[in-house]
C-alpha cells in the first residue's frame, strides 16, 4: 500500500506530467506493443499497430492515461475507484492481468524518458508503488 509520503510524491510529480499525459500514454502503449508482441492480440481489431499510429495514440491518450490520471485522485480507494474498469477487463475484454504490470513498466520507462531530471529515485519508487497498486486494483475482479 502507499504510505502518505508516497501519495504526496505521486501527486506532486503528476502535476508535472499533466499536460503531457496524452503523449505519454500513446508512447507507453506503443512501447508495450513493440517490446511485448503477445500483447498485440488484444488490439488485433485495429487497422495499424505501428508505434505512434492513430489507434495506439488514441487508446493511450483517452483510455490508459485518463485512467491513470483519475487514479491519482483515487489513491485512498483504488479498488473501489477502479471497480468498473476491473470488471470490464475481467469479464468483457478478458485481458490477462499480467499485462497491467507490463504496461505499468512501460509507463515508468516513458515517464523517466520525458522527465529525466524530475524522475528521481524517490519519484521512481513512489510511482512504481502507485502503478503496482493500480495494477492490483485492476486485477481485483479476476479473483
Curated annotation (Swiss-Prot):
Keywords: Acetylation, Heme, Iron, Metal-binding, Oxygen transport, Transport. Red blood cells. It comes from Gymnothorax unicolor. One of its GO terms (molecular function) is organic acid binding. PANTHER family: EMBRYONIC ALPHA GLOBIN E1-RELATED, HEMOGLOBIN FAMILY MEMBER. Heme b binds at residue 89. It comes from the Eukaryota. GO terms for cellular component: blood microparticle; haptoglobin-hemoglobin complex; hemoglobin complex. One of its GO terms (biological process) is hydrogen peroxide catabolic process. Heterotetramer of two alpha chains and two beta chains. The keyword Heme applies. This fish has two hemoglobins: cathodic and anodic. Cathodic Hb has high oxygen affinity, low cooperativity and displays a small reverse Bohr effect. Anodic Hb has low oxygen affinity and cooperativity and displays a normal Bohr effect. This is Hemoglobin cathodic subunit alpha. Involved in oxygen transport from gills to the various peripheral tissues. The modification N-acetylserine is found at residue 1. Residues 1-143 form the Globin domain. O2 binds at residue 59. Belongs to the globin family. The lineage of its organism: Eukaryota, Metazoa, Chordata, Craniata, Vertebrata. InterPro entries: Globin, Globin-like_sf, Globin/Proto, Hemoglobin_a-typ, Hemoglobin_oxygen_transport. The keyword Nucleus does not apply.
